[in-house]
Amino acid sequence: MSWDDEDFDIPSNSKKTVAASWEDEEDDGPVLESWDVDPEEEEKKKKEAKLQEAKRKAELKAKEDAEKAKKDAKRKELEQFDQLDERTRKELLKKAELNADLNNAADLFGGLGVADDNDDDDFDINEHPRERITKQQLAAAAASKRPALTKDTPLEEHPLFQPTNKQEYEKLRKTVGTSLTRLNEDSSLLYASSLAVDLIRDLSQPLSVENLRKVISTLNVVIKDKERQERQARLKKAGGTATGGAGKKKAKPLARPNVGGGFKKDAFDDMDDGQFDDLDDDDFM
């Protein structure tokens, strides 16, 4: 038997396998061409772009806010500098010029560092020590200067209204008393009705009964003194005395005799005029 006479049937399942593979393959998604873009990928890219844009805007806003804060700090520093007295201002300007010269020298000798003009951080590694000291001195001088008082400034912020001992309380009393009593010259009616009476009442609220009696006794002394002064003023105006008497009446001048021609003479005067003859001794015989 030769090999040529034998028939070998070689089973081949390639077609069936391929067919089965195509039939079994299931893809619910749409078939995309080579130039089409996946919608999910596109949405993801849009979200990332939005996040990047929001981040960029936030950084830009933070940078603008930081620049604005620096400008405000510079402006406040200049305002505080303008409020300083002339002597302190000259000293600070002199120190600033000296520090500028030192910083220039530092640049020449290796760039030891000059602080950035727009840098207002508390500490800068590149800031010159002299310039840092100048800033500290300027801040201390501005802080020590008394702020200008306005009508809206609370009185509690004034050092005078922060007494801690007897001397400071007496100074407060004298200062406030003198300042308030001057208002009586402008309007005595408003001073009495809208200030003095109500102020005394308000100041007496925290006092104890014993201290209130002291206040009343003090006011009684003031009342008696005022009554005495007013009585003396009335008597002085009327020409009386300080003790309350009416005073001595002025003596009336004596009446001068009328020596004119119309004055009537009596009988004795007629005798002087020679109307009666001289009597002799024989007339009485």
From Swiss-Prot:
Q: Where in the cell is it found?
A: Cytoplasm
Decide whether keyword DNA repair is in the record: no
Q: Where is the composition biased (Acidic residues)?
A: 22-41, 269-285
InterPro entries linked to this entry: eIF3-like_dom_sf, eIF3j
Pfam families xrefs = eIF3_subunit
**Molecular-function GO terms, alphabetical:** translation initiation factor activity
Keyword Protein biosynthesis (UniProt): yes
Gene Ontology cellular component annotations, sorted alphabetically: eukaryotic 43S preinitiation complex; eukaryotic 48S preinitiation complex; eukaryotic translation initiation factor 3 complex
Segments carrying the region annotation (Disordered) are 1-86, 232-285
Instruction: Give GO BP annotations, semicolon-separated.
Output: formation of cytoplasmic translation initiation complex; maturation of SSU-rRNA from tricistronic rRNA transcript (SSU-rRNA, 5.8S rRNA, LSU-rRNA); nuclear-transcribed mRNA catabolic process, nonsense-mediated decay; translational initiation
Q: Which residues form a coiled coil?
A: 36-81
Q: What is its main location?
A: cytoplasm
Q: Basic and acidic residues: which segments have biased composition? A: 42-86
- Subunit and partners: Component of the eukaryotic translation initiation factor 3 (eIF-3) complex.
Family membership noted in the UniProt record = Belongs to the eIF-3 subunit J family.
Q: Function of this protein? A: Component of the eukaryotic translation initiation factor 3 (eIF-3) complex, which is involved in protein synthesis of a specialized repertoire of mRNAs and, together with other initiation factors, stimulates binding of mRNA and methionyl-tRNAi to the 40S ribosome. The eIF-3 complex specifically targets and initiates translation of a subset of mRNAs involved in cell proliferation.
> Entry's PANTHER family?
EUKARYOTIC TRANSLATION INITIATION FACTOR 3 SUBUNIT J
**What is the protein name given in its UniProt record?**
Eukaryotic translation initiation factor 3 subunit J
Question: Whose protein is this, by species?
Answer: Candida albicans (strain SC5314 / ATCC MYA-2876)
